[in-house]
Amino acid sequence: MAPRVSRLHLALCLLFIALIFSGCNTGYRKVDGKWSYVTWDEGHGYRTNPLGADDSAFTVLGNGEYAKDKNCVYYRGRPIAGAEAGSFVLLKGGSYPYAKDKNHVYLTDVTVVNADPN
């Protein structure tokens, strides 16, 4: 006869799984008082990428993939080359992460060639 799994054991297993996955989120957060982009993977665990961002002007945008301070725009913790932070905004609608500044349109951290930001 096969052993029965009690409801308590099942509940404890589900709770354990939920706790494991709830701690695996990535994104922008303060680590030791400085803004960083934190990722997690099974082989290494947490990886922290300090940004060197201006704390007083740092803002996480939209769904948390983009962020900016007064000098730089970031996508998943990497600076977007040539992006102008003062005019940088996310574009609404669609299922892709488009954004623009006064000079360019971006898809993730890539400049969309010949796209008009106006």
Each model region followed by its residue ranges:
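Bacterial N-terminal signal peptides
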Residues: A11-I20
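Bacterial N-terminal signal peptides that target proteins for export
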Residues: M1-L12
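Non-catalytic tandem-repeat scaffold regions and their flanking low-complexity/translocation tails
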Residues: C24-N118
